């Protein structure tokens, strides 16, 4: 993940992205088009909001991937509330979360079979944008991806991992851990 590269700081990458998108913004305005940034595996919902607000919500929005935020130890409902005013597209996905030692393992699940409360999440998105289209994204297993496997483990007990997520509050992390614990009970039977 770019977030944990050592040759370039993550904050510098975000700043460079904002600078580039600001250069594109006047062109987008002139053409009447809209750009989106996705809540992808390596970027937090806090950072996507930062990008949108810096570039301008009239030309920049968010593609909200409901499961990707879990890989940044964000609670999906909390993230939905953050991004809802800026969501222009969606990737509706679900995932299960369970413990792997002291860390959390992320695994794709069919919608409704993971940790996400879609009733509440969709309501939040609908209140912000009643015309939003919800697109279900079908994910493939990590083993089948062209680039091979990459870790889907969140090291939520590691101080350096947490330091890489400065916007994540103790309260949200605790709510996230509750999701993990509840799903782990399902795994354990």
Predicted regions span which residues?
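Active-site acidic/histidine proton-transfer and metal-coordination neighborhood
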Residues: 1-61
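Histidine-acidic metal/acid-base catalytic patches
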Residues: 45-59, 70-189
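A cross-family glycoside hydrolase active-site/sugar-binding cleft signature
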Residues: 1, 36-38, 63-65, 91-93, ...
